[in-house]
Amino acid sequence: VIVCAIMLLLLTAYATWLVSRYARPGLWLTVVFAIIGVFAFITWSAAGGLVPVTGLLFGALSLSVPLVFGALGGVIGERVGVVNVAIEAQFLFAAFSSALIASVTGSFFLGLLGAVVAGALVGSVLAVFSIKYLVDQVIVGVVLNVLITGLTSFLHGAILQPHTETLNSPERFPRWPIPFLSDIPIIGPVVFNQTLIVYLMYFIVPLVAWGLYRTRWGLRLRAVGEHPTAADTVGIKVNPTRFWNVLLAGGIAGIGGAYF
């Protein structure tokens, strides 16, 4: 632990030196700092005992999946100029819809599609009120969170609980191990023996990062969010661009809701 603390202090001093020279610390510095910090914490907490590292990493990854999808939805909304505070509402409505559709159809894939549509529907309400009627985006998001929380609680008690066997018994996502990769010690069972939603996360995160900064879609999206007047001047339709991207953000957040 002392060695890790010394290394963290050295990294902090190096980052401070870079900032003092008006240089930007690289991403590698943050990653190394985080790894050493986590290792130091595990070493300290497990002093004199055993820590199941694989189980710890598996639990951390499982808890992070919905947060990642929610963050992706928030990033897209923020970049296009709409503050998406209704991510919790998209999670809840997507989780409810996914469970109901998967139970009725017996297909986890249709349940996932239902979650995407449900998240997009909540996003459409946010888009209509904030873009067309110019209602404060934060207020709309908070109202949607309260509304969907109450609505899903009511529907759960009125529909799902009385018919648990038929309407609240969705098929679970199976785990699909990737050949060879899932056999890697420690990392393999955690990263490469997961469900469809986790694999979608592996795919969507770099796709969104690439799309935002390497495609015409991302350029238009960021232009609308950063300077809508200039974007409108060069012929970009600001409101439709915002509307469809808020729907896209809601659909992505809905995938995180299906994970619940």
Locate each region found by the language model.
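Membrane-interfacial amphipathic/re-entrant helices at transmembrane-helix boundaries
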Residues: 1-69, 109
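Hydrophobic core segments of alpha-helical transmembrane domains in multi-pass membrane transport
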Residues: 6-16, 33-42, 149-153, 200-209, ...
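Hydrophobic alpha-helical transmembrane segments
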Residues: 30, 60, 89-92, 109-117, ...
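Single transmembrane alpha-helix segments in multi-pass membrane proteins
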Residues: 55-104, 110-112, 121-138
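Transmembrane helix-bundle core of multi-pass membrane transporters
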Residues: 149-213, 244
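Helix-loop-helix "hairpin" substructures at the membrane interface of multi-pass membrane proteins
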Residues: 190-260
